[in-house]
UniProtKB/Swiss-Prot annotation:
Transmembrane segments: none annotated. It is found in: Cytoplasm. It comes from Shigella flexneri serotype 5b (strain 8401). It holds the Pfam family UDG. GO terms for molecular function: uracil DNA N-glycosylase activity. It catalyses: Hydrolyzes single-stranded DNA or mismatched double-stranded DNA and polynucleotides, releasing free uracil. One of its GO terms (biological process) is base-excision repair, AP site formation via deaminated base removal. It is an enzyme of class 3 (hydrolase). The keyword DNA repair applies. Keywords: Cytoplasm, DNA damage, DNA repair, Hydrolase. The keyword Transcription regulation does not apply. GO terms for cellular component: cytoplasm. This is Uracil-DNA glycosylase. Excises uracil residues from the DNA which can arise as a result of misincorporation of dUMP residues by DNA polymerase or due to deamination of cytosine.
Amino acid sequence: MANELTWHDVLAEEKQQPYFLNTLQTVASERQSGVTIYPPQKDVFNAFRFTELGDVKVVILGQDPYHGPGQAHGLAFSVRPGIAIPPSLLNMYKELENTIPGFTRPNHGYLESWARQGVLLLNTVLTVRAGQAHSHASLGWETFTDKVISLINQHREGVVFLLWGSHAQKKGAIIDKQRHHVLKAPHPSPLSAHRGFFGCNHFVLANQWLEQRGETPIDWMPVLPAECE
């Protein structure tokens, strides 16, 4: 590994900050009072569990976790096996079909295989109430994920940031474009995909950048883990 620093090394202090402890306490209190919160507690930090800091090659920023039953599991845009593929992810698959030779759309939306290759699938807010989009947007998660982005910016070099939509682009404004490769496009949502997400070629461009740096490109074909097949 090129960079031995771990998330634990760089985030331990942040996780002791009063705002962060308040965020965790608010989420825990809501769960205890019977409110359904997504993703389940054990999955909230999966993006960091599956993609260690030293392994990050690509960052894809999402916004809110999915707020439907069984969808969110801690990786932006991804859903568990057996759950219908959400519209934004379907549009990502369409872009992949149109630009990556041999890519065929999978019958699932589970992106763990991307995460295991170094694609940090980071939502900027890490929890949500069932059926209530953006219900946890002001809890403090944004402060935490701002810190995460600044730490990647500081401790890594040559990371590709895929910033889709105005929210991600504002969030990524701090990224040093001399150190990293920033690609911007409209969001893959059906509301905006036809305004320039389709044809943005980001998946190809990300791999070209990685190859130029002598790194292994991402295999964008999502593969289910053996236990899910």
